[in-house]
Amino acid sequence: TDAFFEDMKKAVKQGVRQLTHLCNAMNGIHHRDIGAVGSLFFLPELKGELIADGIHVNREMLQLIYNNTGSDRIILITDAMRAKGLQPGNYELGGQPVIVTEDRAQLESGSLAGSILKMDAGARLMLSLEGVKIEDIIKMASVNPAKQIGVYDRKGSITVGKDADLLLVDDALHIKKTFCRGFIAYEEE
Protein backbone atom coordinates (compact mmCIF):
# COMPACT_ATOMS: atom_id res chain seq x y z
CA THR A 1 0.00 0.00 0.00
CA ASP A 2 0.99 3.58 -0.54
CA ALA A 3 -1.52 4.76 2.04
CA PHE A 4 -0.71 7.97 3.84
CA PHE A 5 -1.34 8.37 7.58
CA GLU A 6 -4.64 10.19 6.93
CA ASP A 7 -5.71 7.31 4.66
CA MET A 8 -4.91 4.85 7.45
CA LYS A 9 -6.95 6.83 9.98
CA LYS A 10 -9.92 6.69 7.60
CA ALA A 11 -9.35 2.98 6.99
CA VAL A 12 -9.37 2.25 10.73
CA LYS A 13 -12.67 4.14 11.03
CA GLN A 14 -13.98 1.85 8.26
CA GLY A 15 -12.90 -1.27 10.19
CA VAL A 16 -9.33 -2.05 9.08
CA ARG A 17 -7.54 -3.76 11.97
CA GLN A 18 -4.42 -5.33 10.49
CA LEU A 19 -1.43 -4.45 8.33
CA THR A 20 -0.43 -7.43 6.20
CA HIS A 21 3.31 -8.06 5.74
CA LEU A 22 4.26 -4.88 7.57
CA CYS A 23 6.96 -2.86 5.76
CA ASN A 24 6.75 -4.97 2.59
CA ALA A 25 5.32 -3.48 -0.59
CA MET A 26 4.25 -0.38 1.34
CA ASN A 27 5.56 3.11 1.71
CA GLY A 28 8.04 3.61 4.50
CA ILE A 29 8.16 6.03 7.38
CA HIS A 30 8.96 9.51 6.09
CA HIS A 31 9.44 12.72 8.02
CA ARG A 32 6.55 14.39 6.17
CA ASP A 33 4.14 11.45 6.35
CA ILE A 34 4.55 8.34 8.45
CA GLY A 35 2.45 6.28 6.05
CA ALA A 36 1.06 2.82 6.70
CA VAL A 37 4.06 1.59 8.68
CA GLY A 38 4.05 4.57 11.03
CA SER A 39 0.30 4.32 11.49
CA LEU A 40 0.89 1.17 13.55
CA PHE A 41 2.64 3.32 16.16
CA PHE A 42 -0.26 5.78 16.48
CA LEU A 43 -3.42 3.79 15.84
CA PRO A 44 -3.90 1.29 18.69
CA GLU A 45 -6.66 -0.54 16.81
CA LEU A 46 -4.08 -1.88 14.35
CA LYS A 47 -2.00 -5.02 14.55
CA GLY A 48 0.93 -5.63 12.20
CA GLU A 49 2.07 -8.88 10.61
CA LEU A 50 5.86 -9.25 10.64
CA ILE A 51 8.03 -11.57 8.58
CA ALA A 52 10.90 -11.72 11.07
CA ASP A 53 13.62 -13.12 8.83
CA GLY A 54 15.95 -10.11 8.82
CA ILE A 55 15.47 -9.85 5.05
CA HIS A 56 11.87 -8.69 4.60
CA VAL A 57 12.31 -6.49 7.66
CA ASN A 58 15.79 -5.87 9.06
CA ARG A 59 16.74 -6.20 12.73
CA GLU A 60 16.70 -2.47 13.39
CA MET A 61 13.19 -2.05 12.00
CA LEU A 62 12.02 -5.13 13.93
CA GLN A 63 13.43 -3.53 17.08
CA LEU A 64 11.83 -0.16 16.26
CA ILE A 65 8.43 -1.78 15.74
CA TYR A 66 8.69 -3.86 18.91
CA ASN A 67 9.83 -0.86 20.96
CA ASN A 68 6.86 1.19 19.76
CA THR A 69 4.09 -1.41 19.87
CA GLY A 70 5.18 -4.10 22.30
CA SER A 71 4.16 -7.69 21.74
CA ASP A 72 0.42 -7.03 22.00
CA ARG A 73 0.13 -5.67 18.47
CA ILE A 74 2.58 -7.85 16.53
CA ILE A 75 1.62 -11.03 14.69
CA LEU A 76 4.57 -13.14 13.59
CA ILE A 77 4.13 -14.76 10.18
CA THR A 78 6.39 -16.49 7.67
CA ASP A 79 4.80 -15.82 4.25
CA ALA A 80 6.63 -19.03 3.34
CA MET A 81 6.25 -20.49 -0.12
CA ARG A 82 6.20 -24.20 -0.85
CA ALA A 83 10.01 -24.34 -1.28
CA LYS A 84 10.44 -23.73 2.46
CA GLY A 85 12.58 -26.50 3.90
CA LEU A 86 13.78 -27.64 0.47
CA GLN A 87 17.21 -27.36 -1.08
CA PRO A 88 18.24 -24.14 -2.85
CA GLY A 89 17.21 -24.20 -6.48
CA ASN A 90 14.60 -23.12 -8.97
CA TYR A 91 10.94 -23.27 -8.00
CA GLU A 92 7.66 -21.65 -8.98
CA LEU A 93 5.24 -19.32 -7.21
CA GLY A 94 2.00 -18.35 -8.88
CA GLY A 95 3.36 -19.34 -12.28
CA GLN A 96 6.50 -17.24 -11.87
CA PRO A 97 9.99 -18.74 -11.68
CA VAL A 98 11.54 -18.30 -8.23
CA ILE A 99 15.18 -18.70 -7.25
CA VAL A 100 15.65 -20.06 -3.73
CA THR A 101 18.99 -19.55 -1.99
CA GLU A 102 20.05 -20.50 1.54
CA ASP A 103 18.14 -17.59 3.06
CA ARG A 104 15.58 -16.20 0.59
CA ALA A 105 13.19 -16.73 -2.30
CA GLN A 106 13.29 -14.18 -5.09
CA LEU A 107 12.16 -13.54 -8.61
CA GLU A 108 14.69 -13.25 -11.41
CA SER A 109 14.39 -9.46 -11.00
CA GLY A 110 15.67 -9.77 -7.41
CA SER A 111 12.30 -8.94 -5.83
CA LEU A 112 11.40 -11.09 -2.86
CA ALA A 113 8.90 -13.86 -3.63
CA GLY A 114 7.43 -14.93 -0.34
CA SER A 115 9.94 -16.39 2.06
CA ILE A 116 11.48 -19.68 3.14
CA LEU A 117 11.34 -18.67 6.80
CA LYS A 118 10.38 -21.27 9.39
CA MET A 119 8.39 -19.85 12.29
CA ASP A 120 10.86 -21.07 14.90
CA ALA A 121 13.67 -19.19 13.13
CA GLY A 122 11.58 -16.01 13.12
CA ALA A 123 10.85 -16.50 16.81
CA ARG A 124 14.57 -16.91 17.53
CA LEU A 125 15.39 -13.69 15.67
CA MET A 126 12.73 -11.78 17.60
CA LEU A 127 13.94 -13.26 20.89
CA SER A 128 17.45 -11.98 20.12
CA LEU A 129 16.17 -8.38 20.09
CA GLU A 130 16.59 -6.18 23.14
CA GLY A 131 13.77 -6.52 25.65
CA VAL A 132 11.94 -9.38 23.96
CA LYS A 133 11.05 -12.25 26.31
CA ILE A 134 9.77 -15.76 25.66
CA GLU A 135 6.33 -14.63 26.85
CA ASP A 136 6.36 -12.02 24.06
CA ILE A 137 7.20 -14.68 21.48
CA ILE A 138 4.27 -16.83 22.62
CA LYS A 139 1.96 -13.84 22.38
CA MET A 140 3.20 -12.76 18.91
CA ALA A 141 3.29 -16.25 17.40
CA SER A 142 0.26 -17.86 19.02
CA VAL A 143 -2.07 -15.73 21.14
CA ASN A 144 -2.33 -12.66 18.87
CA PRO A 145 -2.95 -14.56 15.61
CA ALA A 146 -5.61 -16.75 17.25
CA LYS A 147 -7.39 -13.70 18.66
CA GLN A 148 -7.13 -11.81 15.38
CA ILE A 149 -8.83 -14.54 13.34
CA GLY A 150 -11.43 -15.29 16.00
CA VAL A 151 -10.33 -18.77 17.12
CA TYR A 152 -8.90 -17.93 20.54
CA ASP A 153 -11.71 -19.89 22.18
CA ARG A 154 -9.97 -23.08 20.97
CA LYS A 155 -6.45 -22.10 19.79
CA GLY A 156 -3.56 -19.89 20.83
CA SER A 157 -3.07 -20.87 24.46
CA ILE A 158 -2.97 -23.89 26.74
CA THR A 159 -6.28 -24.09 28.58
CA VAL A 160 -8.61 -26.94 29.52
CA GLY A 161 -11.06 -27.49 26.69
CA LYS A 162 -8.90 -26.03 23.93
CA ASP A 163 -7.62 -28.10 20.98
CA ALA A 164 -4.26 -29.09 22.54
CA ASP A 165 -2.18 -27.79 19.62
CA LEU A 166 1.23 -27.66 21.27
CA LEU A 167 4.92 -27.31 20.49
CA LEU A 168 7.70 -28.80 22.56
CA VAL A 169 10.87 -26.76 22.02
CA ASP A 170 14.36 -26.75 23.47
CA ASP A 171 15.96 -23.75 25.17
CA ALA A 172 16.99 -22.36 21.77
CA LEU A 173 13.41 -22.62 20.42
CA HIS A 174 14.15 -25.54 18.09
CA ILE A 175 11.03 -27.65 17.63
CA LYS A 176 11.31 -31.12 19.15
CA LYS A 177 7.70 -32.27 19.01
CA THR A 178 4.38 -30.98 17.66
CA PHE A 179 0.93 -31.97 18.86
CA CYS A 180 -2.24 -31.27 16.87
CA ARG A 181 -5.45 -31.70 18.85
CA GLY A 182 -3.48 -33.73 21.36
CA PHE A 183 -1.93 -36.16 18.87
CA ILE A 184 1.75 -36.21 17.93
CA ALA A 185 2.06 -34.72 14.44
CA TYR A 186 5.86 -34.36 14.39
CA GLU A 187 8.71 -35.67 16.47
CA GLU A 188 12.37 -34.93 15.90
CA GLU A 189 14.35 -38.04 15.08
Residue ranges and their predicted role:
Residues 6-8, 36, 61, 156:
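Short acidic active-site motifs
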Residues 154, 163-189:
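C-terminal regulatory/interaction regions
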Residues 23, 81, 172:
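Anionic group-transfer/hydrolysis microenvironments
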Residues 32-50, 54, 66-78, 83-168:
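His/Asp/Glu-enriched, well-ordered alpha-helical/loop segment
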